[in-house]
């Protein structure tokens, strides 16, 4: 996308200066994006930029991490995410410039840093925001969006009987239709129909995507408060990194989770073998045949390799980033087992996770969770927020050392 977009940018002078200077202030105590923008404001005229070009270059430098953070750490199915990003960018031209700079910045870090998954996230954000900036986008009401999603699915599942389709629709809450991509809903529908026909209680489906660099694991199982923690533990035990998780619960008490795992192997057969191992571990845990701590303990102890690094643990709770959900952001030293520890504690705090977005920046993990309380509402109490922050911070501090707490 970026290679096509750059051809449509009439004036690239500000982009080139931003690419040159975007990290010039790294290593300073102050935010390097802010300092870099000030430096660009001073140097722009000396580089021959006009005042308008200088302003654009400074803006690009100040915002050069924003698109990556939104794409990797926010729920792109949440309209509030798209509105917030559009408010920052404000014009299509700036959106184009920021996309190109973001792609260059990620790809220049080093081999393996750029992945198809990151590219897909950036493309999704770009295409969602572009109509909003063009003035041609009219936001639908919640009920209209729900009806559009169900109508589109009915066309997709043309071979289904009305009774089958109505049964599937009736199993899901309204939020599912609004937050979930149509392709994913169609996959879920086929999976749930297959489970119904086979009388299966626990069903998994695996698909690999070499272009995006991910393997998708879809899990249908009886809802369990620790289910995502079990999934995280199984992935840790198999040496797999979760990059995204969408969690849904049906009206009849089933969990329907779509997990994206970072691709490691060149051949699909190897990816599928690892995914089957993960699925088997999850099923054994749900059936009480395996303990999650035993599954991940050997992996955690054998990879205690990050003690030389230090990242200040941080827990941020924000009720402004989503209209319906509370957003919890975790910043900590990345290590095997971290996601398991955090998701387990979130479950212990009686919070429901609607989606999880997992990113790593060097040795730093940035895990973002969209959550509600058990009634499906945002976390509204300041004392409740304080307790959540305290408990999660304690987990992060304790897990700086490679040791598992068994409970």
Predicted feature residues:
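Divalent metal-dependent catalytic cores for phosphoryl transfer on phosphate-bearing substrates
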Residues: 2-135
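Regulatory modules associated with amino-acid/nitrogen control
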Residues: 80, 84-407
């Amino acid at each position: 996308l970026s290679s096509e977009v750059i051809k449509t940018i009439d004036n690239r002078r500000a982009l080139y200066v931003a690419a040159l200077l975007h990290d010039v202030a790294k290593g300073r105590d102050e935010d390097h994006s802010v300092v870099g923008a000030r430096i660009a404001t001073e140097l722009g005229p000396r580089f021959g930029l006009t005042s308008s070009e200088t302003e654009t270059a400074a803006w690009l430098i100040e915002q050069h991490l924003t698109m990556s953070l939104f794409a990797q750490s926010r729920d792109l199915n949440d309209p509030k995410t798209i509105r917030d990003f559009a408010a920052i960018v404000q014009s299509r031209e700036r959106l184009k410039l920021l996309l190109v700079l973001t792609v260059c910045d990620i790809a220049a870090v080093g081999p393996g840093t750029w992945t198809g998954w990151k590219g897909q996230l950036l493309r999704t954000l770009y295409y969602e925001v572009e109509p909003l900036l063009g003035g041609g986008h009219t936001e639908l009401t919640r009920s209209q969006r729900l009806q559009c999603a169900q109508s589109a699915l009915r066309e997709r599942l043309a071979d289904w009987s009305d009774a089958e389709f109505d049964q599937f629709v009736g199993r899901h809450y309204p939020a599912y239709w609004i937050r979930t991509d149509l392709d994913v809903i169609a996959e879920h529908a086929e999976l749930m129909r297959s489970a119904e026909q086979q009388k299966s209680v626990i069903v998994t489906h695996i698909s690999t995507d070499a272009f995006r660099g991910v393997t998708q694991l879809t899990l249908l199982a009886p809802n369990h408060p620790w289910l995502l923690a079990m999934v995280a533990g199984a992935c840790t035990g198999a040496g797999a990194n979760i990059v995204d998780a969408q969690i849904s619960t049906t009206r009849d008490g089933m969990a329907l989770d779509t997990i994206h795992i970072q691709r490691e192997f060149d051949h699909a057969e190897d990816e599928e073998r690892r995914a089957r191992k993960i699925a088997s571990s999850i099923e054994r845990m749900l059936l009480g045949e395996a303990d999650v701590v035993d599954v991940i303990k050997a992996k955690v102890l054998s990879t205690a390799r990050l003690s030389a690094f230090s990242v200040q643990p941080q827990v941020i709770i924000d009720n402004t980033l989503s209209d319906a959900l509370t957003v919890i952001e975790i910043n900590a030293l990345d290590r095997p087992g971290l996601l398991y520890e955090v998701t387990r504690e979130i479950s212990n705090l009686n919070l429901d996770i609607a989606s999880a977005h997992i990113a790593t920046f060097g040795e730093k993990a940035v895990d973002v969770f969209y959550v509600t309380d058990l009634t499906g509402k945002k976390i509204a109490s300041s004392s409740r927020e304080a307790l959540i922050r305290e408990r999660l911070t304690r987990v992060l501090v304790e897990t700086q050392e490679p040791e598992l707490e068994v409970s």
